[in-house]
């Protein structure tokens, strides 16, 4: 079977698709992965680019309403237009038997219909699959149970997607015959790449929604950095990572984390990512190591604690490692995951970004450390998940 995989977003959106691509290829399928231009090219995968620079669209030059509106017009909207067109062009060129796509690939339904092939949508948090049991993960009510009104919150992401309907229609020029199909078929299935240990399946999800657990490589091919390995072996440590987030004062965040960790006698591995964390000179010392990134499967298993932004991928990686957490959400589905981790006993109550301080972290770290036993239990259960295997089983059954 020829599988076209299309994803958009940050590392947490790309790496799971790469894991799916590798596993599907290992089972004899022909797979092509379309991904953002600034994503690391995955080894051993046939890939193409989507004319999308995610870091650029996540980094507006200012935080005033005017600056954000200008950024939306000048960067976000044009980037989405290019991605919509590139997704159509690359999918048509590959001639797939099945299209598997991220919800942000807004032209995927159109191109699948035009080619007469089924499609499957992938969710890393419940945003497109509505439920009366919980609110949409990415909206302003993501951490509040609205009861009977929960289902209405899913209208927000649908309304945002409709803003680009005109761009999707114009991308039909890339289709065979240059015309948009006069219908839109529903997805054949939804792959909810979420662990039931962090989000038990709501009883009103339809049968076509398959909750597979998270997608990750079962064995890392990367070798640990000797400098990082030596640091980790020297005593208890915290892993601090805000991934792709870069909003606000990175040095102030680094200072708060290092100060709070030292209060608890912990050393700190700072992963600077896209610039969301930095270490002020006055905080430097032998108990702190700063690197841009490191494989989570190397640095998390021995950690006493993780401080992170609550992205879906990071939340699953930390919980799967059996490590308690302090979550500082920035945006999107991060407040949802911070609340879920706390609800299931593996993290302290989330600290809103605007309230982050050394004092707040001292208290939260103490709380999180007391949850080690529960984190170990949940991690053991999550490591039984075989997300990519189950996902490919579903694709093969369609």
Q: What is each PLM-predicted segment?
A:
Residues 103, 123, 272, 310-311, ...:
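Nucleotide-sugar donor-binding loop of glycosyltransferases
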Residues 1-11, 15-32, 38-46, 149-162, ...:
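Nucleotide-activated sugar donor-binding and catalytic core shared by glycosyltransferases
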Residues 53, 125-126, 274-275, 331-333:
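Short glycine-enriched loops at secondary-structure junctions
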Residues 12, 108, 199, 218-219, ...:
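Flexible loop/turn segments at secondary-structure boundaries
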Residues 32-237, 242-255, 262-266:
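Nucleotide-sugar-dependent glycosyltransferase catalytic domains
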Residues 18, 109-113, 258, 315-316:
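Short, hydrophobic alpha-helix immediately C-terminal to the catalytic nucleophile
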Residues 255-289:
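Catalytic donor nucleotide-activated moiety binding site of glycosyltransferases and closely related
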